[in-house]
Amino acid sequence: LKDGSNDTIEEAHWASDYRMLGSVLNNEPQGLMARLEVEVPGWRSAEPGQFALLQAGSSRCFLARAVSVADEVGARVSFLIAPVGEGTRELCALNGGDMVWVVGPLGRGFDVDALVISRGRAVIVAGGAGVAPFPLLLARMARRHRALFSRPVGEGPGGPQASTLEVLVLLGFRDALQAEASTLLREVAALACESGLRCRVEVAIEDGLRGPAEKVTDLLIRHLRSGDRVAVCGPTPMAEAVWSICASKPDVRAWFSLETGMACGVGSCHGCLITLADGSDARVCKDGPVFLGEAVFGG
């Protein structure tokens, strides 16, 4: 895609033309983050890992903010938001009945089938605010697993030996307050267990005030095994360390939702451009935010 092409102009117009006006249903703190639930008329179902552009109806900010879709039930969409700047602070301060401009869902998400249809185990690795996309991913994995493996033997992929999917969720936080952001994910994990997934959640807290001082990478080193399929989201240094661990094991595939600043959200401004391992450029908002680990970090 070249700068100044008609495609970039059309993408920018699409973002402005397809804004939806949502109404805040609930906004509750979860540690250092806010769980914002919005009713969005016209919302199209999101893939896990996709995001939306959000802007408070009365915002003083020029640009909307890119926020991962954390969960959805029809037009009721939940977001986990960290107040890191003026725009996100405005979103975290909204009350029931306030209005929000929404564009989305946008981007490319996780490959649910690759995580579910596998001889290995599914592993979710999240650091800090990187927990945000995983409630929806876990819910969709449970739904897809039921659809595939609740059929009689011979009518679909898998069989008796694939009737239970093991999912290991590894979470890392600076302290116990930040760890409260995992509340929604834990709720979804409990429901996933009831639906037939064998789901286990482990949490590493770095400050060591309520147990051993550990990072999420310590948990991954302890538990990762050959054949695992891994979904990752977190700060770049954590993602790089996770990839190094994954690359050290045979037959491990990992998908990374990259944390990077976005402006337009539709690929027209090239503000989130990254260079991939093969030397080509990619727009995180359009070509991602989810990429295979080897594409980003190299083989």
Language-model features, listed with the residues they occupy:
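Active-site donor-binding loop signature of nucleotide-sugar glycosyltransferases
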Residues: V40, E206, D287
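A charged, well-structured terminal subsegment
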Residues: G293-G299
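A general structural signal for well-ordered alpha-helical segments in protein cores
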Residues: L21, A46-G49, A66, F134, ...
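Ferredoxin-reductase
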Residues: K2-D98, F173-R174
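Short, charged beta-turn/beta-strand-edge "cap" motif at the junction between a beta-strand
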Residues: G57-C61, G104-G109, D278
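Local cysteine-cluster metal-coordination motifs and their immediate loop/turn environment
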Residues: T236-P237, E259-V290
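FNR/FR-type flavoprotein reductase catalytic core
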Residues: R89-G261
